[in-house]
Each structure stands twice: as C-alpha cells, then as structure tokens.
Amino acid sequence: MTHPRDLVAGITVPYRIRFDECGPEGIVRTSALLRYAQDVAWIHSERLGFDRPWYAERGLAWVVRAAELGILAPVSLGATLSISTAITGFRKVWARRRTEARLEDGTLALWCHTDWVMTDHRGMPGRVPPEFPAAFAVVPGSFEPGRVPLPPTPSDAAVLVTRVRPQDVDPMGHVNNAAYLDYLEEALIAAGSAAQAAMAATPRRVRLEYVQAAAPSAVLDGVAWAERIDSDPAWAWRLADPADGRDVARGLVLPG
C-alpha cells in the first residue's frame, strides 16, 4: 500500500484514449487532455485524504482561474498515456499544479499548468488552509498566476454564439473548465482554415484565463481573431456576456 508520504511528490495514473474523446482524425481532443489533468488532480487529492466530503465539511472548494497547456505530440485513439501530477506552488489563496502526460515510449506529449483559487462557502477567495502546504511539502510564493490580457476585439473577428450545454456542468454546479476549451476550439473552427490549422498543430500552446463563471444554460458571445503576441502569430479568443459585455473567459493558441 502506498504511504501518504510517498504521494507528496505526486502520482502517475494511466489513461487509455477512448473513441468518444477523439475527433475525425482519430486524435484526442485538447479538452480531453485537460479533463485528464483535473481527474488525476482529484485522485492525488483523495489519496492524501482531501476528498469531496473533506471539502464539503469545511465549506471549501478549489476553482480553476488559469490554465496553460503545451501539446507536444498528437495522441491517437487507443494509446495509453501515463499522466503524472504534482503541486508546484502555493501563494495566499492560490495553488499551482503541473501535469505531464507521456506516451508508452516515454515521449512527453503534454504538459499543463493549472492555477487554482481556494474559495469558501460563499464562493469568495480564502487563504489556503495550512494543511495543504504541509501535506504537499511545497514552499509558498513560488509562482505567478496566469493571465491572458487581450486587446479590444477587432471588427473582423469571427463571431460564434456559444450556448452552455447541460453536459458542460460538473458536480460542483459549475461549467467545467475543460468545456471552455471546447468553446475556444468551436470559435476557431468558425474563424476559418488558418485558425483550424493552428488548433491542430503540434507543438502548440493554449493559454486560458477564467474571468468569471458562466451560468448553466447561458448564451454567450464567442469571438476569435488572428493576433501577434511578442511577435509570434497567435489566435485570440474571448467569451463575453452579451448582457453587460464583460469577459467570461479569454484564451490564446500559440506556436509551441
């Protein structure tokens, strides 16, 4: 039996790529990779004693505020990924996880950083309980939370009405963070062939910032356009609430 102290440095779990997780080319969707990352994070937390009842008893929950993925190699239907995860930093209300996925020959196919905020029973940010840095043996203050600042949306941006589907809502009653990746990719499909090529390229990076929660059944405005970030070509994405124009989420797809 694995002793809790052996879990401090992280865990590794195998995942077989399922038929329903792949697109027409037989390659796993980016959102499925992010779903693996959140699932293995839960497994790690549970094995250390921080399961859903533990959080419910204390009125606490983690909410993802930013994610960055590096997709280094295509992963095909039926492949098995060895997915490892570890906490790499804490700061006040924040925690960062790093997740890596390797093919059966050891090739690194994916890395992912997810930045989480601890929230209380009101849904407001609250300090990370002292149990966490102690359990994960991580020194606080060791990372800068991810942000995706974007310029105003240009007039020629592709526009796609985005509807939150019932299957996008997770057990916390939130739109799952991986669903936003589906929304991003749907907007890029609407933007045309160049955007679609960037979305399928390897290596590539995807950066997401979750600005505010989308409500279940919400109808939102998704827009995508070509952009340059530090002289590199990129595709930008914005999801906004049409009622007030405020951003719900922002994203970038960049060369690897």
Residues of each region from the PLM?
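Hot-dog-fold acyl-thioester-processing enzymes
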Residues: 2-64, 119-205
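Acidic/His-leaning functional-site neighborhoods
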Residues: 166-250
